[in-house]
A protein has these predicted regions:
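Translation machinery proteins
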Residues: 5-71
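Short, charged, intrinsically disordered terminal tails
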Residues: 213-221
Length: 221
């Protein structure tokens, strides 16, 4: 773990590992992990945002939207898998969780208060910082379909994890997603954070090793 690898070489190495391992799971997820030099206990050093991956995620994201009035239909028209108001809140409260992302309009936030216990631990609570609390539900749905992923630094360890595509992607597609994600994380450096912000960057696969990336090679061509 102490040797630094060129980003493109790391992608190729992991793709070759999957091929050579004879794993039945041939289309594995590539994941980016970034260790941040922040104090997660400090309110002014929280890192949470989102990024639209230029090559997409390679998987279908199931989107649920909590909205009122005509915005419920707008969400459905944009392609949301589920949309509703009180009845959808009740369904989630009763334990239904057949979605990957939850989007809510600002006027429904009082309804969502009762879902904190259910959604919080799963990291599914809508938040304005990552664009999941918005009045423009149609845009939020379209962005998510286009490959938008949200991320946040974990409270313990200050590590950001996010998927950057599938092993079926080309090296260029994975590299473009990797660079976009790293740039977005860099952009979200809290002003109160001192010292080295991005301490280490790793790329790993679902069933295999993680490789430490030389950050100087994370430059878009």
């Amino acid at each position: 773990f102490n040797t630094y690898t060129d980003a493109r070489l790391a992608i190729d190495t992991l793709k070759k590992f999957i091929k050579d391992s004879g794993s039945k799971n041939t289309n594995q997820t590539f994941e980016l992990s970034v260790k941040l030099g922040i104090d997660t206990k400090a309110n002014d050093q929280q890192v949470r945002s989102s990024v639209v991956l230029p090559s997409g995620t390679g998987k279908k994201t199931r989107i649920a939207v909590i909205a009122k009035g005509e915005k419920v239909q707008a969400a459905k028209d944009a392609g949301a898998d589920f949309a509703g108001t009180e009845e959808l809140v009740q369904k989630i409260q009763d334990g239904w969780m057949e979605f990957d992302v939850l989007v809510a309009t600002p006027d429904t936030m009082p309804l969502l208060g009762k879902l904190g216990r259910v959604l919080g631990p799963r990291g599914l609570m809508p938040n304005p910082k990552d664009g999941t609390v918005t009045a423009d539900v149609a845009k939020a749905v379209k962005d998510l379909q286009a490959g938008k992923v949200t991320f946040r630094a974990e409270k313990t360890g200050a590590v950001v994890h996010l998927p950057i595509g599938k092993s079926s992607f080309s090296q260029d597609e994975l590299f473009a997603n990797l660079v976009a994600a790293v740039q977005e994380i860099r952009k979200n450096k809290p002003s109160a954070s001192k010292g080295t912000y991005m301490e280490s960057v790793f790329v790993s696969i679902t069933q295999g090793p993680g490789l430490k990336i030389d950050q100087n090679t994370l430059v878009a061509v």
